[in-house]
């Protein structure tokens, strides 16, 4: 996908990886970048607008844990304004295994619900034009950080959901791929809680190993967007972009 002149919705586009990715997207010259985030950050929005004045950057407050009907109402406002949307990026995520229900609600259910809502506008069975979804998952969806099993499981669920979306593309007209960052230097990983305090130093221990910057991750994210490969499972780790081959151990045969 050539980003230039496209209309993009970015859920959580002001977060750690999200904001640097928003910067890289704006540099590539989309027509519209619509950022949906829980907390408004006027300074960040102003920075994005200044980075490329030709790009229309707009912000709407959005909590991914709201019901599908609420998300659909918000998306209708956006679609009525833009007429078409080319790409949805689902990027909301939290890392805190003390908050079990919220971790699942944000990292998994929120991705499912936002995707379900946009299908009302994109699904070709309803006369829609189709579209592209990029879901930010995690390398923990491949192999868990076992000290944060709730977070890891939520990301594995989001990855599985994305893989299914890709296979449904011939039916819906909506393609999908996953973005799976490795350990990236964000506020998310500086301090977080392990499940039942099984490892109080989990954040410190993780950061003792090689990491990547948010800029490195963002630059590779944009490369994945440009590749636009339905069903791709992208690993963004240590400053590199790599397509992962999923190992099949079972098949439903349907």
UniProtKB/Swiss-Prot annotation:
Matching Pfam families: adh_short (PF00106)
PROSITE patterns (alphabetical): ADH_SHORT (PS00061)
Residues the record lists as binding substrate: 138
This enzyme's EC code(s): 1.1.1.1
Domain of life: Eukaryota
Entries under InterPro entries matching the protein: ADH_Drosophila-type, NAD(P)-bd_dom_sf, Sc_DH/Rdtase_CS, SDR_fam
Biological-process GO terms, alphabetical: alcohol metabolic process
GO cellular component: cytoplasm
List of catalytic residues: 151 (proton acceptor)
Residues that coordinate or bind NAD(+): 10-33
Entry keywords, A to Z: NAD, Oxidoreductase
Disulfide pairings: none
Gene Ontology terms for molecular function: alcohol dehydrogenase (NAD+) activity
Catalyzed reaction equations: a primary alcohol + NAD(+) = an aldehyde + NADH + H(+); a secondary alcohol + NAD(+) = a ketone + NADH + H(+)
Record note on quaternary structure: Homodimer.
Protein family according to the UniProt entry: Belongs to the short-chain dehydrogenases/reductases (SDR) family.
Protein name, per record: Alcohol dehydrogenase
Organism ancestry: Eukaryota, Metazoa, Ecdysozoa, Arthropoda, Hexapoda
Gene this chain is encoded by: Adh
């Amino acid at each position: 996908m050539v980003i230039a002149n496209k209309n993009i919705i970015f859920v959580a586009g002001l977060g750690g990886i999200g904001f640097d990715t928003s910067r890289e997207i704006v540099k590539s010259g989309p027509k519209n970048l619509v950022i949906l985030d829980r907390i408004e950050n006027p300074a960040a929005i102003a920075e994005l607008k200044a980075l490329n004045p030709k790009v229309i950057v707009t912000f709407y407050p959005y909590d991914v844990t709201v019901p599908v009907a609420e998300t659909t109402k918000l998306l209708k406002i956006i679609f009525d304004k833009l007429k078409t949307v080319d790409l949805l990026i689902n990027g909301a995520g939290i890392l805190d295994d003390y908050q079990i229900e919220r971790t699942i609600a944000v990292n998994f259910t929120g991705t499912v619900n936002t995707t379900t809502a946009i299908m009302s506008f994109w699904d070709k069975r309803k006369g829609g034009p189709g579209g592209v979804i990029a879901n930010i998952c995690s390398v923990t969806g491949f192999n868990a950080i076992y000290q944060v099993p709730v977070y890891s499981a939520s990301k594995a669920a989001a990855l599985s959901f994305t893989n299914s979306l890709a296979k449904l593309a011939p039916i819906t007209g909506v393609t999908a791929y996953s973005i799976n960052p490795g350990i990236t230097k964000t506020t998310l990983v500086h301090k977080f809680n392990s499940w039942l305090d099984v490892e109080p130093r989990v954040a410190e221990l993780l950061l003792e190993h090689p990491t990547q910057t948010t800029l490195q991750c963002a630059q590779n994210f944009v490369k994945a967007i440009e590749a636009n490969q339905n069903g791709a499972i992208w690993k963004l780790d240590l400053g590199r972009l790599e397509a992962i081959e999923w190992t099949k151990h079972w098949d439903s045969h349907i």
